[in-house]
């Protein structure tokens, strides 16, 4: 700790809604007993990094979720119980955009993390690849699959029934390819949607069949392909059009739908009652109360954080075994200053089939 700089920089939300700026002179945090202090080596961008600040602005809060870096200090409990040590390479996700904890966010030089929320990076992964896995979207995927959709199969205990389908809408996204891999390991057949140019990409991660989301009959085509038996739909995109496509794809017996965004309840109210709809808010996995407006408020839920910590351990094993691999990455130079440019590119939908990663060291 003695050799650390006296201050650091961070990408924070500015006063202009949906905009960002570099904040300088920020203090280096000190870990509590259960925390580790990490020097950030690389960060990766998620759509939530620009969407949440636009929807629930919290000026001055640090932005960013996915990171990789090196442990440079541990709290007393973390040192005794986590299995980590100084110098370990770790990755994970910060649950940013929190009014009550404005310092939490990955787009900075040094971060605090709960020791049970980080995973050990194997030598087979680069800093950039580890950041691309992170855990922000990937943990939301886990929450969607096993909490909202309530799937019976897991990678550790896959289903044995043949021909059980799950739809991943938006399969060429980083969350999509991670979901496809988890579902295949859990024994499911995966159908997905993306642009035709990305059909090969999603198939390389395990999708059985890809459908063009531009097609007005996309949902009906999926329903036909799955023999009117589809029960589960995971919607990474979660817009009015994608919701309609997912509902159209689910078979006559109904099923479950899970979105990655706050659902438009007026639209859901007009849809089939035989489909149970939910959405996942990744901030819940902190286990803390999240004081945000507009449907994003979360009650404290320590049990969910315990579940999340166990999920991270399972991911860590699968990653070390090479059973889960990162999304294709696009490495961009320029550090934190260029992260702001990258967020603009994502907002303008200029990125497809790649995970934007920025080395900081």
From Swiss-Prot:
Positions contributing to NADP(+) binding: 48-51, 172-175, 195-198, 213, 260-261, 351-352
Molecular function, one GO term: nucleotide binding
Pathway: Mycotoxin biosynthesis
UniProt EC number: 1.-.-.-
Keywords carried by this UniProt record: NADP, Nucleotide-binding, Oxidoreductase, Virulence
SMART domains xrefs: PKS_ER
Superkingdom of source: Eukaryota
SUPFAM superfamilies named among the record's database cross-references: GroES-like, NAD(P)-binding Rossmann-fold domains
Pfam families the record matches: ADH_N, ADH_zinc_N
Transmembrane segments: none
Task of the protein: Trans-enoyl reductasee; part of the gene cluster that mediates the biosynthesis of GKK1032, fungal natural products containing a macrocyclic para-cyclophane connected to a decahydrofluorene ring system that show potent antitumor activities. Within the pathway, the PKS-NRPS gkaA, with the help of the trans-enoyl reductase gkaC, synthesize the polyketide-tyrosyl acyl thioester product which can be reductively off-loaded by the terminal reductase (R) domain in gkaA.
Family note: Belongs to the zinc-containing alcohol dehydrogenase family.
Complex formation: Monomer.
PANTHER family associated with the record: HYPOTHETICAL OXIDOREDUCTASE (EUROFUNG) (PTHR45348), TRANS-ENOYL REDUCTASE STHE (PTHR45348:SF1)
Protein name: Trans-enoyl reductase gkaC
Species assigned in the record: Penicillium citrinum
Gene designation: gkaC
